[in-house]
Amino acid sequence: MHFSKFWPKKAIFVVYVKRQDMAAISNNEIKKVKALQQKKFRDETGLFIVEGEKMVEEALKSHFKVEDLYRKNDIGDEAMKRISSLSSPSPVLAVVHKPSDIYVDDVASVASMLSEGGLYLALDTIRDPGNLGTILRIADWFGADAVFATRDTVDVFNPKVVQATMGAIFRVKMHYV
């Protein structure tokens, strides 16, 4: 069938094509994942972001529960740029559950976590995310059993801290006292 008799010669045709790269993630999901870059939303949801192939692999091997997994091949470059906290987004991002025992309310609880001969690190008011991540990496290297920090220390689930740990966040227990 020839369309010229139905449409004027200079008609403009608009065709809606669903973008392939956004097919696997909705705008609402993008907003929820992006919101996890803020401590308020991490605390409300009990979730945090892990970026990078090695980091996500560490998360999957650990006792942490992975809620969602996003691959650039599935959601596309634009969607990955929108949900990533990195200037150059990695090909994979995971949304992971925070452990339930991160906050300790009393000294008796702390004492019950300690074992004779264990290696523990106590931190007070670490404010720089990169520094906390590096400290956790060093604690992991030395085989620390746990790290205890004051509550005014930067959030261990801050995306910059998570990146700086290079996976140590999944091997060293962290507690806020």
Question: Where do the protein language model's features map onto the residues?
Answer:
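Structural motif
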Residues: 47, 67-69, 91-94, 118-121, ...
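Conserved beta-strand termini and adjacent loop/short-helix elements that scaffold enzyme active sites
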Residues: 72-78, 150, 177
